[in-house]
Each structure stands twice: as structure tokens, then as C-alpha cells.
Amino acid sequence: MNNKVTFLGTGTSTGVPVIGCHCQVCKSENPHNKRLRTSIIVQTKNNKTFLVDTTPDLRMQLLSNSIEKIDFVLFTHEHADHLHGIDDLRPLCFSFNGKELPFYALPEYENSLKNKFPYIFNRTKKKILGGGVPLLKYCPIILGEQIIEDVKFNFFLLPHGRMKVLGFQHDKMAYII
């Protein structure tokens, strides 16, 4: 089996059409002009499935592609259009039988993620499966080569406005946002 990449969304940070926009693209009936925010899911040839970014559209992206299980999540950067679907990981955590779903991000994003979602990361009570929060475990990404869950990556930084974001190469595929 080869790797399989599913594009869950290829739109801008607002998605397409944009609310209140009356341009030709946003008014178009062409299904190619109806795009959710950017994310992919990769099913590797060694039977691992990983998600790149959790957009605010994540629930519909997963449902419309019949995705019920992932092994880990990669975050490319800390913008809202790449993070704010994080709560929709809850049902995917159920298959981990009380264990935390690993998510990977650059070390400089760890505090930002934890501060943006304190209800997930600042739990003081015992973790309860299905207790209203996703059970997630932060794992650092190291630039260069790294093996995650038997999946080999080469991670690198890219310019994205005034910040740097994470890109990666896996097998014969590269992901550049």
C-alpha cells in the first residue's frame, strides 16, 4: 500500500466563500469554489494515520471523509484557523481507551497552545474518558529528521507572514503551508 493523502480543506483562513463577500468566486455555484480551511489527513503505508492541523471546520472535514481514527496530530503553527477545531478531537480520543492522543508541535508553540485551551491542558481532576475535553499529550517536534509512531519525517521551517511555520517531508510527499 502507498501513502494516501486526503485534502480536508484547501481554503484560506476564512474559508471560501467568505462571509459577506460578493466577488465572483464567493458567489460561484462551482463546487471547486467551496473550500474549507487548510488541513490534510495522511494514511501511511505502515498503517498509521495522522492529521495535520485542527481547523474550525474539523468536525465536518472528518465526517465528510469518514475518518474515525487517527494515531497522532501535527500542528504547523498557532494561528486560529489551524488550531480552533482542537475540541473536535474528543470523539477520536475515545479509541485510545483512556490514553492521551499525542499531538506534535514545535516547542515554542507548547505554551501558546496550553494558554489558548486551558480547559484541555490545565486539568486538575482525574482524566475522565469522554469527560467533555479531549485527552491530549504534547510531544515536541525537532527540526530535521524525526520518527513519530514509526513514521519518518524531515521537519523544516518556512516563512508565513511575520512568523515561521512548520513544513515537513515524509516519504515522497512534502507539506508546505
Regions found by a protein language model. Give the residues of each.
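Binuclear metal-dependent hydrolase catalytic cores
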Residues: 1-176
